[in-house]
């Protein structure tokens, strides 16, 4: 983990109300470059809502968001993307009928000019070369760039989704990656592959926020863990200073909040 004095992403006093329901209550969260922050909590604790605030899908009722120290307002996911934040969704959001290179290039296609300079065509060969280079830099091994995503295993699909987010944020080593249950429904070997990729991204300077119910994964891959319970942050602790029993206590409410 790097030691930057300014967080890559910082949320202060975030409230999110749905009518009389307070989904988020004065949430303070920060993550630094090269750090993996685990975000834990039971169903309905507010994890997904908080991710949606970070990704620009939801606008908070009140509170402040800062990216690399600069105050930011996200009115849409495009705003957060422009700020250097990428979201890897639980459903992966891959195009099954397209090949790996095309999925890695979505939104940043390489075009070559058409006849007489009119219009333009996707340069698939150039995209495959770029995708191969990017995966090599990430230390990722996967199937051939021409293989359709629908023919990949669950673990391979997850790696493609993670790599797509990583290649979009990793150019200046200042990106922020939001991961929503990246190992859901994966087997042990596939989970290990994803876990290794997350650590490599952090080692390359990417700030990662990982939402998961998988406590062993969180303990293995995260530098720090924050726990939400009923919309409030009840714990924020380095992994080295906690254990499964403490985390389960905060998640279930059996253990009092660190901030009470």
Write out the residue ranges for each language-model feature.
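Glycine-rich phosphate-binding loops of nucleotide-dependent enzymes
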Residues: 2-260
């Amino acid at each position: 983990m790097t030691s930057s004095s300014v967080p890559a992403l910082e949320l202060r006093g975030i409230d999110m109300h749905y009518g009389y329901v307070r989904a988020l209550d004065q949430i303070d969260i920060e993550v630094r470059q090269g750090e993996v922050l685990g975000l834990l909590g039971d169903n309905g604790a507010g994890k997904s809502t908080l991710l949606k605030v970070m990704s620009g899908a939801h606008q908070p009722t009140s509170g402040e968001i800062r990216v690399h120290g600069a105050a930011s307002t996200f009115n849409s996911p495009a705003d957060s993307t422009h700020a250097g934040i990428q979201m890897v969704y639980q459903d992966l959001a891959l195009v099954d009928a397209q090949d790996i290179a095309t999925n890695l290039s979505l939104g940043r296609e390489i075009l070559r000019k058409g006849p007489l300079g009119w219009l333009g065509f996707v340069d698939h060969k150039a995209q495959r070369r770029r995708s191969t280079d990017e995966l090599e830099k990430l230390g990722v091994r996967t199937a051939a760039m021409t293989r359709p995503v629908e023919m990949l295993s669950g673990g391979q699909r997850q790696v493609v989704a993670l790599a797509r987010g990583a290649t979009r944020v990793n150019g200046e080593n200042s990106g922020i990656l939001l991961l929503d249950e990246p190992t859901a429904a994966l087997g042990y070997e596939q989970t290990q592959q994803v876990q290794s990729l997350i650590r490599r991204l952090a080692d390359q300077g990417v700030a990662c926020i990982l939402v998961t119910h998988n406590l062993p994964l969180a303990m293995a891959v995260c530098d720090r863990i924050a726990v939400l319970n009923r919309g409030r942050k009840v714990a924020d602790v380095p992994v080295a200073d906690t254990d499964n029993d403490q985390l389960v206590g905060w998640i279930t409410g059996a253990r009092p909040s660190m901030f009470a």
